[in-house]
Amino acid sequence: MTDRENVLFEDNADRFTVSGPEMDSHYGTGAVFHRRGGHFGSIAPIRVPESFFPDNSSVLYTIRPDGVSLISPREKSDGIKYSTEILMGDGASDIMIVHSIKNTSHERKKLSVWSSTALRAGGLEVIPQSFGDTQPMQPNRILALWPGTTLTDPRLFAGERYLTIRQDPEMEKEFILGVNNITGWAAYVLPDTTLIKRYVHDETSCYPNHDCSYRTRVSGCFAELDSFSPIYLVEPGEGIRHVDNLSLFTTRNGVNPVDETSIENFIHNLC
């Protein structure tokens, strides 16, 4: 087995944290959320402080034949309990990550699961455009932009079938974009490895972020590939869950970020 660089982002310098008066008043003085990198799950719509529980305590874990289960302590301020299953059976090519959120409070909550995968610098993100309904009088795509994000950003290429976003270590400004990703996948192409993230988009449900089931956040350090469950009304004692499937492929030739035929052939050869 050869040594390969981790495809996930690692915040070894602890640069990406959330703290301040809102965190202090909600979780206690000195509360800090550390992004750390890698993959994590939380609640959406994304907001401070609720989506940034400083989960710095020990977790309960169970080793299973096909993976591991992780259960965080009950989050007392909001009555939320998080659990994560990381599963990979013998001979499987995918890692399945199941995020579950239970409402342990006495109040109904309106929630979505936020499943975030942060990947290391130097890659190209590929997002399919979702055409959905083709009735000429109805819109069939949603594009959501966050404050500070512009469509003239040089990292973005908007084609007829795909969007591509380059992660550029020289550009610190964050680029954040959401889409109604009906096909339920996105790819991140590194020089020697490609990761594909898959999930199920339910066209009959409503999603956060102006009905976008997918969001990306690209900075000078990483690219974050985020999927979301539908929004649910969660009664006390009930829970919701969301599943991501992550696949890794060894790739050498890369892809032309502005050539949609090249992109389509590249993805087709992987899948």
Please identify what each model-predicted range represents.
Residues 1-96, 104-271:
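Surface-exposed acidic/polar loop and edge beta-strand patches at domain peripheries
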